[in-house]
Each structure stands twice: as structure tokens, then as C-alpha cells.
């Protein structure tokens, strides 16, 4: 683990352990939760099994104490989650193989919300990334987050995905913004740590070949999908911590992502 990541984790432990302070305002950092909660209405890919929580126990035991426990199930790729590179690139990293250092780092937030609002099939372009670099500096080595503000539509599947239908036929009816494959290749050349977005996929809804996934994952760059609250982050200055459930051999996993900002 690098010294920078260790220092960030020390700040988190210190912030969360101070009595009388909330996690969102503790210490010298302000924390922003970038994950949707998992629930029965969480949005999953139309062909994927949704989230299910089965109650095992919820009540008083014969011994006189209260006890609650549940079983949960669902596809890897739904809700706020991480895509491991192996999801679209044979032989690349599965979830447990991704170094922690790659999931913690400076966030570069690309705001395309105004364009995405009126164009459901909008795709982030290379020109926009180049313009962002001219304004804010090199993007190399950061975690790139694409803000469309589609997270504000969650959990309304009709507005978020373009359809409430399920099954194979529903995939052709998906409409939401994503990242153009040329932009993905441009990011891969700059060795970014990971790429995230506040929509259901880093590829736009009408993608048939998932070229954006393939371009990034072939270079072992993970994806973060269905993020939330990116509107609360500045273009630069936030540190992202994106830690998935550590599933051995997983092509993806549920994700709790947070951003740390100076107060």
C-alpha cells in the first residue's frame, strides 16, 4: 500500500472515530457518499437479477433478546458497483486482484450534465477531455468521474434507463449518456486509475459492442457505475475512495464509494 493511500485511510479512521461528529463533517475533511443504497427498487441491467433481501430473523428470541439477520442476493452488476476489467477483457483483473491503490486517488470530475439533460444518448468526447485538461491540468493518474446528473433520476427506471421493461428485448430500448470509445481510448493512453459515471454504464445506452468497456478494461482500468452525488464534487480537489466487496473471481461487485473534500 502506498504512503498516500495509507495517509488517506488514517484520516478516514480518525474522522469516523471522533465522538460527537458525523461522518459527513468529521475532522478536517468533508465526506460525500457517492453510492445509492441497495433496495428492492435498485436499478439493475434489464437482463440481470435484481437485489433481494430475505428476512431470516427479526424479533425476540426464546432467550429473551432481540435478533435480526437477512440473506441477500443479486447480480454483480447493479446498483452502485465496480466493474472489474475481466468483465469485458479475458485474462484481466478480477475484483480481488485490483490493487487498493488503484481505487483511491484524486478525482477528476467532468461535468457534461447540461448536454446530457437534453440528449439521452450523449457521449463524452475527446475534445471535452482535452478542454478539461486545458482548464484544470493533466488528468493522468487520477480517477475520472463523468457527471451527467442522471443519478437524480434514481430509482425511476423509465427516466434513468429509458425503459422499465426487463429481459433481452429491453436492452435495445436503453437510452442514457455514456463515454465515447475514442474518449475511453484517450483516457487509457493517459493511464488513469479508474473511470466512473452516474449512469447505468460507461458505454451509452444504445451501445451494441461495448467498445468503451473493452478499451478501458483491456488496459486493466476498472469502471465505477451508477454513482451518486457527483454534483457535490468540484472539478478537482476531491479524493475518491471506491472499495468494492472483495469477491474472489468476481467480474464486478457492490461498491461503497466516498469522496473526501477539504472543509
Where do the protein language model's features map onto the residues?
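Active-/binding-site microenvironments in catalytic and ligand-binding cores
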Residues: 17-263
Amino acid at each position: 500500500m502506498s504512503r498516500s493511500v495509507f495517509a488517506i485511510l488514517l484520516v478516514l479512521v480518525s474522522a469516523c472515530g471522533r465522538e460527537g461528529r458525523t461522518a459527513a463533517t468529521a475532522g478536517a475533511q468533508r465526506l460525500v457518499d457517492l453510492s445509492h443504497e441497495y433496495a428492492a427498487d435498485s436499478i439493475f441491467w434489464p437482463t440481470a437479477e435484481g437485489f433481494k433481501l430475505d428476512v431470516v430473523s427479526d424479533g425476540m428470541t426464546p432467550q429473551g433478546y432481540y435478533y435480526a439477520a437477512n440473506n441477500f442476493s443479486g447480480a454483480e452488476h447493479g446498483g452502485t458497483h465496480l466493474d472489474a476489467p475481466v468483465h469485458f477483457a479475458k485474462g484481466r483483473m478480477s475484483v480481488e486482484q485490483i490493487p487498493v491503490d488503484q481505487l483511491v486517488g484524486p478525482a477528476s470530475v467532468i461535468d457534461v450534465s447540461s448536454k446530457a439533460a437534453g440528449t439521452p444518448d450523449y457521449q463524452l468526447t475527446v475534445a471535452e477531455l482535452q478542454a478539461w485538461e486545458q482548464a484544470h491540468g493533466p488528468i493522468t493518474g487520477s480517477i475520472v468521474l463523468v457527471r451527467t446528473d442522471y443519478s437524480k433520476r434514481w430509482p425511476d427506471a423509465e427516466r434513468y434507463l429509458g425503459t422499465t421493461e426487463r429481459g433481452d428485448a429491453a436492452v435495445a430500448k436503453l437510452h442514457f449518456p455514456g463515454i465515447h470509445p475514442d474518449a475511453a481510448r484517450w483516457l487509457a493512453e493517459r493511464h488513469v486509475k479508474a473511470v466512473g459515471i452516474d449512469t447505468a454504464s460507461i458505454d451509452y445506452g444504445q451501445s451494441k459492442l461495448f467498445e468503451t468497456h473493452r478499451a478501458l478494461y483491456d488496459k486493466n482500468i476498472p469502471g465505477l457505475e451508477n454513482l451518486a452525488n457527483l454534483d457535490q464534487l468540484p472539478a478537482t480537489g476531491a479524493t475518491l475512495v471506491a472499495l468494492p466487496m472483495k469477491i474472489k473471481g468476481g467480474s464486478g461487485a457492490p461498491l461503497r464509494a466516498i469522496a473526501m473534500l477539504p472543509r
